[in-house]
């Protein structure tokens, strides 16, 4: 009787395990072409963000292009972090790409006050979308520095 009960229990557990392996449809239907293009842009942005290049204007360009075309990107929190930190560094006149304030378009886009506001907006959006982000601690530190009254 014990052998029969044990066999029945093993059979029930195996059927349960198999039914748990059903195909799960993703919560968000992602376009594979847009996802691949966004992943490429993210990779290029990380390379530009790194200590060797510090090309923060390029990072912002890649972010703006990707966010405009595909705001549902699966790794948008990384992009928001890069955009926020790039805005922050540019507002402090850091980086290897020069901002030419004689050109009106660059003067408007890279105005230090506007960059600080953008940094807070991007980092806050990142925290709102993904509160458990691995970039959370650094983002909160920068937001606190830029908005000390809150």
Language-model features: where?
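Acidic, polar-rich low-complexity tracts and alpha-helical solenoid repeat scaffolds
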Residues: 2-6, 15-150
């Amino acid at each position: 009787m014990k052998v029969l009960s044990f066999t029945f229990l093993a059979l029930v557990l195996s059927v349960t395990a198999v039914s748990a392996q059903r195909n799960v449809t993703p919560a968000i239907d992602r376009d594979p072409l847009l996802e691949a293009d966004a992943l490429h842009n993210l990779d290029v942005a990380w390379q530009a963000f790194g200590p060797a290049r510090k090309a923060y204007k390029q990072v912002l360009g890649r972010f703006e292009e990707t966010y405009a075309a595909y705001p549902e990107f699966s790794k948008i929190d990384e992009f928001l972090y890069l955009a926020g930190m790039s805005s922050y560094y540019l507002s402090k006149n850091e980086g290897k790409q020069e901002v030419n304030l004689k050109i009106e378009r660059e003067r408007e886009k890279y105005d230090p006050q506007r960059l600080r506001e953008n940094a807070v907006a991007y980092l806050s959006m990142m925290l709102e979308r993904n509160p458990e982000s691995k970039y959370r601690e650094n983002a909160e530190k920068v937001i606190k520095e830029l908005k000390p009254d809150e």
